[in-house]
Amino acid sequence: MKKKAIYPGTFDPFTNGHLDVLERALTIFEEVTVLIAENSNKNTLFTVEERMDAIREITIGMDGLHVEVLHDGLLAEYARDVGANAIIRGVRQVKDFEYEFQLSLLNRHLNPDVTTVFLMPNVKYTYIASSIIKEVAMLGGDVSKFVHPSVLSMLHRKRKELKPNTTS
């Protein structure tokens, strides 16, 4: 049986921390699906299509990697449907772990065949969240150390769309 994992998230935007966790997951699992959540409860900056295109561009050439969208439904059921035996979650701080631990227990209840695997990113990414990256970028700050150049370009374009009288 192939070791297959799902790496779910909003990925708005996909950061170097996300990439770091993904690269670690690919050393453990034969197949990893980056699963973009189309979460109507979150106010996203980028469309699902924009996020999917960005992730595909950043991860081109990575063996065993797939990028999909979860439009609705439960993650545990999706894992069952695609035959995944693990859910990857990046954990930066204790605060993240408490929330993720609760989700892990619920997913295990819904699908006893799936295990949540917690991976810590490189320490240089532990204090950066997508929400902070978006906020700083939309205010004109430099986030180039925390995102891929293509994501940085997307952030600059989005800033110009939303605030047309700004430079950068």
UniProtKB/Swiss-Prot annotation:
Its signal peptide is none
Please state the Enzyme Commission number of this protein.
Answer: 2.7.7.3
The annotated pathway is:
Cofactor biosynthesis; coenzyme A biosynthesis; CoA from (R)-pantothenate: step 4/5
A GO molecular function held by the record: ATP binding
Q: Where along this sequence does the record place binding of ATP?
A: T10, F11, H18, G90, V91, R92, E100, Y125, T126, Y127, I128, A129, S130, S131
Question: What Pfam families does the database record attribute to this sequence?
Answer: CTP_transf_like
Cofactor needs? Mg(2+)
What keywords are annotated for this sequence in UniProt?
A: ATP-binding, Coenzyme A biosynthesis, Cytoplasm, Magnesium, Nucleotide-binding, Nucleotidyltransferase, Transferase
Record site feature (Transition state stabilizer), residues: H18
Which coarse location class describes where this protein primarily resides? cytoplasm
State its location(s). Cytoplasm
Catalytic activity, per the record?
(R)-4'-phosphopantetheine + ATP + H(+) = 3'-dephospho-CoA + diphosphate
Binding positions for substrate per the UniProt entry: T10, K42, L75, R89
- Set out the biological process GO terms recorded for this chain's protein: coenzyme A biosynthetic process
Quote the cellular component terms of the Gene Ontology held in the record: cytoplasm
Lineage top rank: taxon: Bacteria
Q: Which family does it belong to?
A: Belongs to the bacterial CoaD family.
- What does the record give as the function of this protein? Reversibly transfers an adenylyl group from ATP to 4'-phosphopantetheine, yielding dephospho-CoA (dPCoA) and pyrophosphate.
Oligomeric state and interaction partners are given as:
Homohexamer.
Protein name (record): Phosphopantetheine adenylyltransferase
What is the organism field in this record? Chlorobium luteolum (strain DSM 273 / BCRC 81028 / 2530)
